[in-house]
Swiss-Prot record:
Subcellular location, record wording: Secreted
Disulfide bridge partners, by residue number: 4-41, 13-33, 20-26
One annotated GO molecular function: mating pheromone activity
The protein's name in its UniProt record: Attractin
Protein source organism: Aplysia depilans (Sea hare)
GO-annotated cellular components: extracellular region
Known role: Water-borne pheromone that attract the marine mollusk Aplysia into breeding aggregations and coordinate male and female reproductive behavior within the aggregation.
Keywords: Disulfide bond, Glycoprotein, Pheromone, Secreted
Length: 56
């Protein structure tokens, strides 16, 4: 699981919003997407125990 990898997050988010085009809010959406992927990643690594992480 390489959500933590910034390049992976970037391409994942760009793929997710590829139909969005170059509109200014698309860039914001992509940035937000990258941030949330990285946050998920940080939470996962900080809870390095083997317990399943459940969404809040």
């Amino acid at each position: 699981n390489n959500k933590c990898d910034l390049e992976f997050a970037s391409s994942e988010c760009q793929m997710r919003y590829q139909d969005c085009g170059e509109a200014s809010n698309c860039t914001a959406l992509i940035e937000e997407c990258k941030t949330s992927l990285q946050e998920e990643c940080d939470q996962a690594s900080s809870e390095s125990s083997s317990t399943t992480i459940r969404p809040e």
